From Swiss-Prot:
Domain spans labelled FAD-binding PCMH-type: 58-234
Name of this protein: Delta(24)-sterol reductase
Family designation: Belongs to the FAD-binding oxidoreductase/transferase type 4 family.
Superkingdom, taxonomy of origin: Eukaryota
Gene field: Dhcr24
Residue spans crossing the bilayer: 32-52
Annotated GO MF terms: Delta24(24-1) sterol reductase activity; Delta24-sterol reductase activity; enzyme binding; FAD binding; oxidoreductase activity, acting on the CH-CH group of donors, NAD or NADP as acceptor; peptide antigen binding
Membrane topology: Single-pass membrane protein
């Protein structure tokens, strides 16, 4: 009884403090209090609910039957929109705060919202090595199911809450992408509802133009209702090597060399300054040396990026065996390194042991509760960007990141970009090795001004035939955007499929003016 009374007294005192200081003051200056007391427990409840729901639905095998009914319901909504005169564009009815992007699309308030309640794994076919899923299936769901039966996705992007739909309509990448490409490159079929309410299935050999145009289109060619994705046999552990490297030239040379070695299942780099990095290479294995086993995903363990930094500080190489699912979600608990700005003591051993089992808070709930003042502060004093540049331009790109934003750590993830039709492809006719440079945090450059600094960075990326991930703030104008992306197939299909009066152009959904 006494703990309950103490908790009630603490809650009452907190509410009185909020009343005196004001909710906005607390959310901005002591946000960790609000996050720890409210968002962490709420996030845990969300996770438990969705995990239990997904398990029950899959065990009852009810998803395929429900799927057909839900698809018919989406078609009905689209046809009703047409019958009512097609007065506004359509978009999915999923609230903007539920997405992993830091911004919320303004268009949700003005467009016709089509409700798409598709969040289940439909089928796992181990003979064909295919998993068929609905668009709102998360990476957490996928790993929980596939890893338990000895399978995995060739490319399994990091954060638990990333969805299949977002990774196809936007993009997705992981440390295995040097072998398999982006998330779109492991997909074998898409099922969509088009602007006229019709259903279409597209593959590399059937409706191939649409198949190659869908990735990066952000839902502006149709509504994704299912996808078929390759699966491969999984092993229990990742044998991960850590190697600190100093000097930018040595870093780029080592990273490129390891990315070209296809015997590496995983390649990743964390850059802690312009000339200090730890490069990690891994292979899947069923064998383990017990003394080197590290269950890094356990709630009481140090955050992964801090653990990696120790190899740099002590200037030693290392070898560890990490459980496969722990490896896949190694950056989830700390949201890469963003959580250190929200809960500054989050990596403290005492906090980890007492409350680490509730971490991380849902990104969606962080967005929902941030408020207008905090949103503006984040916009001007916080950067979240992923720029994809050719590997040969890596050194030049890192100098540009240093000069324009100066954010560390920086995430380095290699990927092979095939020469295929669509919005994103290499400049030449052959596949090319690229690197994703991810910068997340507070810029340290003097007199940082978000718009001018980001436009300068975007200009550099265009000049080397690179690409910007579309979840991030985009300051390019329309002409610059279509200089970066190849819109030839995309515009052809928008006209051919009647999308011009049904969906906004992709630029109008992702540009800075379209989000808040």
């Amino acid at each position: 009884m006494e703990p309950a009374v103490s908790l009630a007294v603490c809650a009452l005192l907190f509410l009185l403090w909020v009343r005196v200081k004001g909710l906005e003051f607390v959310l901005i200056h002591q946000r960790w209090v609000f996050v720890c007391l409210f968002l962490l427990p709420l996030s845990l409840i969300f996770d438990i609910y969705y995990y239990v729901r997904a398990w029950v639905v899959f065990k009852l095998s009810s998803a395929p039957r429900l799927h057909e009914q839900r698809v018919r319901d989406i078609q009905k909504q689209v046809r009703e929109w047409k019958e009512q005169g097609s007065k506004t564009f359509m978009c999915t009815g999923r609230p903007g705060w539920l997405t992993v992007s830091l911004r919320v699309g303004k268009y949700k308030k003005t467009h016709k919202n089509i409700m798409i309640n598709l969040m289940d794994i439909l089928e796992v076919d181990t003979k064909k090595q295919i998993v068929r899923v609905e668009p709102l299936v998360s990476m957490g769901q996928v790993t929980a199911l596939l890893n338990s039966i000895g399978w995995t996705l060739p490319v399994l992007p990091e954060l638990d809450d990333l969805t299949v739909g977002g990774l196809i309509m936007g993009t997705g990448i992981e440390s295995s992408s040097h072998k398999y490409g982006l998330f779109q490159h492991i997909c074998t079929a898409y099922e969509l509802i088009l602007a006229d309410g019709s259903f279409v299935r597209c593959t590399p050999s059937e409706n191939s133009d649409l198949f190659y145009a869908v990735p990066w289109s952000c839902g502006t060619l149709g509504f994704l209702v299912a996808a078929e994705i390759r699966i491969i046999p999984a092993k229990k552990y990742v044998k991960l090597r850590f190697e600190p490297v100093r000097g930018l030239e040595a870093i780029c040379e080592k990273f490129t060399r390891e990315s070209q070695r296809l015997e590496n299942h995983f390649v990743e780099g964390l850059l802690y300054s312009l000339d200090e990095a730890v490069i990690m290479t891994g292979v899947m294995t069923d064998d383990v040396e017990p003394s080197k086993l590290n269950s890094i995903g356990s709630y009481y363990k140090p955050w992964f990026f801090k653990h990696v930094e120790n190899y740099l500080k002590t200037n030693r190489e290392g070898l560890e065996y990490i459980p496969l699912r722990h490896y896949y979600h190694r950056h989830t608990r700390s949201i890469f390194w963003e959580l250190q700005d929200i809960i500054p003591f989050g990596n403290n051993p005492i906090f980890r042991y007492l409350f680490g089992w509730m971490v991380p808070p849902k990104i969606s709930l962080l967005k929902l509760t941030q408020g207008e003042t905090l949103r503006k502060l984040y916009e001007q004093h916080h950067v979240v960007q992923d720029m994809l540049v050719p590997m040969k331009c890596m050194s030049q790109a890192l100098h540009t990141f240093q000069n324009d934003i100066h954010v560390y750590p920086i995430w380095l993830c290699p990927f092979i970009l095939p020469s295929q039709p669509g919005l994103v492809h290499p400049k030449g006719d052959e596949a090319e090795l690229y690197v994703d440079i991810g910068a997340y945090g507070e810029p340290r450059v003097k007199h940082f001004e978000a718009r001018s600094c980001m436009r300068q960075l975007e200009k550099f990326v265009r000049s080397v035939h690179g690409f910007q991930m579309l979840y991030a703030d985009c300051y390019m104008n329309r002409e610059e955007f279509w200089e970066m992306f190849d819109g030839s197939l995309y515009h052809k299909l928008r006209k051919q499929l009647g999308c011009q009066d049904a969906f906004p152009e992709v630029y109008d959904k992702i540009c800075k003016a379209a989000r808040h």
